[in-house]
Regions:
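N-terminal FAD cofactor-binding segment of flavoenzymes
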Residues: 23, 27, 43-94
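Helix N-cap at the beta1-alpha1 junction of Rossmann-like dinucleotide-binding domains, i.e.
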Residues: 38-40
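Short beta-strand to alpha-helix junction loop
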Residues: 57-58, 108-127, 181, 187, ...
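Helix-loop-beta segment of a Rossmann-like dinucleotide-binding subdomain
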Residues: 97-118, 156, 254-257
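Predominantly flavin-linked oxidoreductase catalytic cores and closely associated redox partners
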Residues: 131-272
Length: 469
């Protein structure tokens, strides 16, 4: 990190960039976000962020982290109509890998989550960032950072004017630190190669996700749950999710994995819902009213750029958010992982020892690894995911977890444990402790014995039934 903390610059003003800017504002005199889009003054989607029209989950852990970063955020979201999920049995219907979790009981531990639309959450964060005197958002397109070979340092970025200002010349903005929060389209690996550094190795998981989403109105009172999820399974490549948003509308997102195409019309989406959801949801959908046309999006692969493995890294620049790791969006963990990385950035900036990039990249890897690994096991086991040389233990682990989820259908203790771990609340590792593994085995053995007794009883009744004369 430069000895001068005069100016920090962030590439991208989406959720990751806003989180980074909020942290940087406590350490730098000025923070500038460079954003190519003209940002809306109200909650509204952007053409360059096509994923914001589809279902987004803000996990309970992410809500806590965002509140720490932006105090008062959760209260303001609820005041704006954002649904809040508490530990009541009627808040969520969650079917994971073909197993409908037994969440029909009040959770024993506190569990509070929030369901903002992606545009609303981004608007809330942007509003708070712009209230800080030392942060500004500048519209423009980053051409490339300026690299100083003599000091092996990035000293700023060259910024092109927005598309509607063709006559203006590119401008150089000097900075003591550049944060690349450009998302999945990051060009940092290319820049590193150009500057004489090694590109980071990439771990990828080909999942071939295709989305189709429909906004709709459902009359009040027909659905008690605010979150409805029926994920894909090893024998079914289609799934769906429904969320109730802050304006009272719902979004219904259908998705396919391994290249499977989701239904393209609302009528066909409803037909899929009839196959995947209990009858009460379909009765409500029968009275729903679609708003606008369906919207589509594709997510071919999850990627993790292993900056933590590099021996050399230039000073004055760090990667952040999806520029480091982009997760399978059907797990809904991306925004929460970004909020965790904001904490890593703060601690790295506070540390008097070591270089910033090394500390941030290593801390990010420590929280990315368990979530990436658990997601990869799920992708291999249930989503027909493809990756290079997967560890031999992944598929057996997926099969064991399938047994756990099967038991969690009727055991609320197991269901609550999974829901909290899936929300990244208690730990980033989804590894059941021995007592829960024992509970799972006992539960499944009990089910097997009951089925055996019922089968034997049925055969006995058949053998002793009187013959017809």
């Amino acid at each position: 990190l430069s000895t001068s903390n005069n100016h920090a610059l962030v590439i991208g003003a989406s959720i990751a960039g806003l989180c980074a800017a909020r942290v940087l504002s406590d350490f730098f005199h000025r923070v500038t976000l460079i954003e190519r889009d003209e940002l809306p003054s109200v909650p509204h989607g952007r053409a360059t962020v096509p994923q914001d029209r589809h279902l987004h989950m803000l996990m309970a852990r992410g809500a806590n982290e965002f509140e720490n970063l932006f105090p008062g955020l959760l209260t303001d979201m609820v005041a704006a109509g954002v649904p809040m999920l508490e530990n009541r049995p009627d808040c969520i219907y969650f079917a994971a890998a073909g197993h409908a979790l037994g969440t029909g009981h009040t959770l024993r531990k506190e569990f509070t989550a929030y369901v903002p639309s992606r545009p609303h959450l981004e608007w809330q964060l942007r509003r708070r960032v712009l209230e800080l005197d030392n942060i500004e958002i500048v519209r423009g397109l980053v051409i490339e950072p300026r690299f100083e070979p003599t000091t092996q340092t990035v000293s700023g970025v060259l910024v092109a004017p927005p598309d509607d200002d063709d006559g203006a010349e590119p401008q150089f903005l000097a900075a003591d630190l550049v944060v690349d929060a450009a998302g999945r389209g990051t060009r940092l690996p290319v820049w590193l190669s150009k500057w004489g550094y090694q590109r980071p190795a990439e771990q990828s998981m080909d999942i071939g996700i295709n989305y189709a989403s429909q906004q709709l109105r459902i009359p009040d009172g027909l659905i008690q749950e605010k979150v409805v999820v029926a994920g894909v399974a090893h024998d079914r490549s289609l799934g769906l999710g429904m969320l109730c948003y802050e304006d009272g509308t719902w979004v219904m997102t259908t998705f396919g994995v391994a290249g499977a195409k989701p239904p393209p019309t609302f009528g066909e989406m409803r037909a899929l819902a009839e196959r995947l959801l209990p009858a009460r949801f379909n009765a409500a959908l029968a009275q729903s009213e679609p708003i606008g046309a369906p919207m589509f999006h594709a997510f071919p692969a999850s990627k993790w750029r292993r900056y933590d493995k590099l021996d050399r890294f230039p000073a004055g620049i760090v990667p952040f958010g999806d520029a480091v790791a982009s997760f399978n969006p059907t797990f809904g963990q991306g925004m929460t992982m970004t909020s965790l990385q904001a904490g890593h950035l703060r601690r790295a900036l506070q540390s008097p020892h070591g270089d910033l990039a090394t500390q941030l990249n290593r801390a990010t890897a420590k929280t990315t690894y368990p979530v990436w690994t658990m997601n990869a096991i799920g992708d291999i086991s249930f989503h027909h995911g493809l990756t290079q040389s997967p560890p031999a233990w992944w598929r057996p682990a997926g099969a064991l977890f399938d047994q756990f989820l099967g038991a969690a259908e009727t055991d609320p203790v197991l269901a609550e444990w999974f829901l909290r771990r899936f929300s990244l609340l208690d730990s980033l590792y989804i590894v059941p402790p021995p007592r829960l593994i024992g509970r799972t085995i006992a539960h499944n053995v009990g089910l097997w014995l009951r089925e055996r007794r019922q089968s034997a009883s049925s055969r006995g009744r058949t053998l002793t039934a009187p013959r017809s004369p």
